[in-house]
Curated annotation (Swiss-Prot):
Residues 242-533 are annotated as: Catalytic. Zn(2+) binds at C333, H384, H510. The gene is thrS. It catalyses: tRNA(Thr) + L-threonine + ATP = L-threonyl-tRNA(Thr) + AMP + diphosphate + H(+). Catalyzes the attachment of threonine to tRNA(Thr) in a two-step reaction: L-threonine is first activated by ATP to form Thr-AMP and then transferred to the acceptor end of tRNA(Thr). Also edits incorrectly charged L-seryl-tRNA(Thr). Transmembrane segments: none annotated. It is found in: Cytoplasm. Binds 1 zinc ion per subunit. One of its GO terms (biological process) is threonyl-tRNA aminoacylation. It is an enzyme of class 6 (ligase). The keyword Transferase does not apply. This is Threonine--tRNA ligase. Homodimer. GO terms for molecular function: ATP binding; metal ion binding; threonine-tRNA ligase activity; tRNA binding.
């Protein structure tokens, strides 16, 4: 007898080997129809998988995350099936699942057109409607190589040839198409109903620019029509909010071909940058951080000690001078340890907090660059806390509360918390890891945060908390980090004198709240769709005249506004052009300014202004003092 244990703890008995589909059918016809796969322990398997011994089993449906993964994986194969039907000369390569969808790479004699994409999607729907069974078979490696060579699928043959000789490989067939795959897959193509092809892009075979350029077709697939529509709507919103588009329209920045992956900030964009940086500088100052500044170029011997030269060199920009090798720093932490090591440190000096707006460089591949979100040169709000193990809990608790306030001030209220715990390969004692992991989790509990645990996802040198923002359209951005590090102080020989008079290693806490300032500003632009809160807006007020008779009055208003707030002048522009007032209002509205002040003869005579708020809201005529009170309140409340 074979005993199958279901998720609710109940058991079912079977006389002999039984498939996942048969177990589902024994539970109910509805579940049998909905079943996409099965999960035995942590392994997801086909519904045709035969269970030969007592096992725990859950039936995977479209409602499960694993079910969505199977749908997307199978839809990638459906895409390849449709392409081969329409373009028999195309060669298939690989087609993995990615975030929110999938892609498949093809080799073909000409580029696929938008019309081709529409035809492929239509053919996919037709093939899905046939509800053809998806059938798995296993071949010895060499036989599989010969099989795909015989089909003219040389890329597939190359992939299989790289597999060890003694391994078998699995193939999946649907209708007239068969593909190499580990699986699992849906039981039939009829399970694939809600998908859309998104775009075609270029991709090098095996990611190597020396190889042939392939065509990558991207698609998305979902469990329900509603989820697909929600996702497509989110993409439409994301396109409207695209920071690259808004950066051009609002004249904030540009990326230039002469320096790919680095940002040219225009005056308005640099004003925004300065506001973010000065805010974070106040955060440093008000929370016990000492701001420091380290060099950007450091000798390779330092990077050898930290392990970066061995493990990370391909991502570093290197140079040579006077027969010495140097690298542009990809991170700030080694420099902070060098500062810590200057002079003798006592246990009384701990915790010692350093903060730096450190410019870093990483040699990201060109294909991975994305506006100001993914760049090669970036600045971090990088902080490092040198402390003892006993300090970790208090430091992490204070940091989480601080991070929550910062995110709230920038308009983010939905934060996801994750604790990444010890991997199998690690340094440090189990006792130290126990203490550090407990401190991280307790710090989140003390801050009232619900969190998930990511077992084994910590770095080899310590556990960490990841803080992820959820934006206005549901996208997630991992920005903040609190990383415990037992390793780098050891590697770079950092010490302090303990209460016992002996030498001890400090624990190092790496922390960043916004992370890359470039990326965070990109997130801010997209979160607010370019309509930045008043306190961040590069231009807060535009003063417009109706006729030339109000020019001097408008200049006077602007001058008063620029001096209106103590320690903070308002950012004001005047528009005195001889243009229709409706034209000028529209132009400044498109720049998403928080306020537009209009002055005609009546306003000039009354010593007042007509106020228009963003969103075409007419607030009527008010005195300049009343307007200053209004905008001061906006700035103070960070709206």
């Amino acid at each position: 007898m074979i005993h199958i244990t279901l998720p609710d703890g109940s058991q079912r008995e079977f006389a002999g080997p039984v498939t996942v589909a048969e177990v589902a059918a024994s539970i109910g016809s509805g579940l049998a129809k909905a079943a996409l796969a099965g999960k035995i322990g942590d392994k997801v398997v086909d519904t045709s998988y035969q269970i030969t011994q007592d096992s725990p089993l859950s039936i995977v449906t479209a409602k499960d995350a694993d079910g969505l993964e199977v749908i997307r994986h199978s839809t990638a194969h459906l895409l390849a099936y449709a392409v081969k039907e329409l373009f028999p000369d195309a060669q298939v390569t690989i087609g993995p699942v990615i975030e929110n969808g999938f892609y498949y790479d093809f080799s073909y004699k000409r580029p696929f057109t938008p019309e081709d994409l529409a035809a492929i999607e239509k053919r996919m729907a037709e093939l899905a409607a046939k509800d053809e069974p998806v059938v798995r078979r296993v071949l010895p490696r060499d036989e599989a190589v010969a099989y795909f060579k015989g089909l003219g699928e040389h890329y597939k043959a190359e992939i299989i040839a790289s597999i060890p000789t003694n391994e078998d490989v699995s193939l999946y067939r649907e209708g007239g198409f068969e593909d190499l795959c580990r699986g699992p897959h849906v039981p039939s193509t009829g399970k694939l109903k809600f998908f859309k092809l998104m775009k075609v892009a270029g991709a090098y075979w095996r990611g190597d620019h020396r190889n042939e350029m392939l065509q990558r077709i991207y698609g998305t697939a979902w469990a329900t029509k509603e989820e697909l529509q929600e996702y497509l709507h989110m993409l439409e919103e994301a396109e409207k909010r695209d920071h690259r588009k808004l950066g051009r329209e609002l004249d904030l920045f540009h990326i230039d071909e002469h320096s790919p992956g680095t940002v040219f900030w225009h005056p308005k964009g640099w004003t925004l940058w300065q506001e973010v940086e000065q805010y974070m500088r106040r955060v440093y100052r008000d929370n016990g951080y000492q701001e420091v500044k380290g060099p950007q170029i450091l000798d390779k011997t330092l990077w050898e000690k930290t392990g970066h030269w061995d493990k990370y060199r391909d991502n570093m920009f290197t140079t040579e001078s006077e027969k010495r090798d140097y690298a542009l720093k990809p991170m700030n932490c080694p420099g902070h340890i060098l500062i810590f090591k200057q002079g003798i440190k006592s246990y009384r000096d701990l915790p010692l907090r350093y903060g730096e707006f450190g410019q870093c460089h990483r040699n990201e591949p060109t294909g991975g660059l994305h506006g100001i979100m993914r760049v090669r040169g970036f600045t971090q709000d990088d902080g490092h806390i040198f402390c003892t193990e006993d300090h970790i809990l208090a430091e992490c608790t204070a940091y989480t509360a601080l991070l929550q306030k910062v995110y709230k001030d920038f308009g983010f209220h939905n934060i996801i918390y994750k604790v990444a715990t010890r991997p199998e390969a690690r340094i440090g004692s189990d006792e130290s890891w126990d203490k550090a992991e407990h401190a991280l989790m307790e710090s989140l509990r003390a801050s009232g945060c619900e969190f998930e645990i990511a077992p084994g996802d910590g770095a080899f040198y310590g556990p960490k908390i990841e803080y992820t923002l959820k934006d206005a359209i549901g996208r997630q951005w991992q920005c903040g980090t609190m990383q415990v590090d037992f390793s780098m102080p050891e590697r770079l020989d950092a010490e302090y004198v303990g209460e016992d008079g002996g030498r001890h290693r400090p624990v190092m806490l790496h922390r960043a709240i916004v992370g890359s300032l470039e990326r965070f500003i990109g997130i801010l632009i997209e979160e607010h769709a370019g309509a930045l809160p008043v306190w961040l807006a590069p231009v807060q007020v535009a003063v417009l005249n109706i006729t030339d008779a109000q020019q001097d009055y408008c200049r006077e208003i602007a001058a008063k506004l620029q001096k209106a707030l103590p320690n903070q002048g308002l950012r004001v522009v005047t528009d005195l052009r001889n243009e229709k007032i409706t034209y000028k209002i529209r132009e400044h509205s498109l720049q998403k300014l928080p306020y537009i002040l209009v002055a005609g003869d009546k306003e000039k005579a009354a010593g007042a202004v007509a106020v228009r708020a963003r969103g075409n809201k007419d607030l009527g005529v008010m005195s300049l003092d009343a307007f200053v009170d209004l905008i001061a309140q906006d700035i103070a409340s960070k709206v």
